[in-house]
Amino acid sequence: MPKVIAHIAASASFFALVLLLSVPHAWGQTSAGSVSAVNGTVSVERAGKSTPAADGTAVQVGDKFTTGPNSRLTIKLSDGSQLELNESSTLVLTQDTLNPDGSRANTKVTLLGGLVRSLVHFNPAGAPNFEVHTPNAVASARGTMFDVSYHEGQPPPANP
């Protein structure tokens, strides 16, 4: 009887490993891109620990970036899209998934304050879903450049 239980446990472990390895590449993705430029004071908070951001820093889902006054940050995502965070801004990368061919499937960021410029890479094989969330709105784009700003307690700017 103990040999049967050991055999069942070994088989279950093997099938669990096969299942984990068969999950699409996007699940196992460890880096969504990297920091390509830092000007001034910029921090990245990961797993509750804040450190200064530097050129080449890997960007992961859940990372929270904060720029100080007169500071800027540029993040290059793995598909070539770019995020440019303006001074006194805070941004969280909340989702980043890729298609099996490595093209972007879904990216979501949350702008908690300040301004972000998004340069979204166009993929002719299938446009990615790229969203910028703020506490009161969502902007979505596929293959374009756009700015989103959010300043708590301030009315949105008037359209010209």
Where are these regions (language model features)?
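Flexible, surface-exposed loop/linker segments and immediately adjacent secondary-structure boundaries
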Residues: G28-P160
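N-terminal secretory signal peptides that target proteins for export/translocation
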Residues: M1-H7
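Intrinsic disorder/low-complexity signal
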Residues: I8-S11, G62
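Bacterial N-terminal signal peptides
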Residues: A10-S22
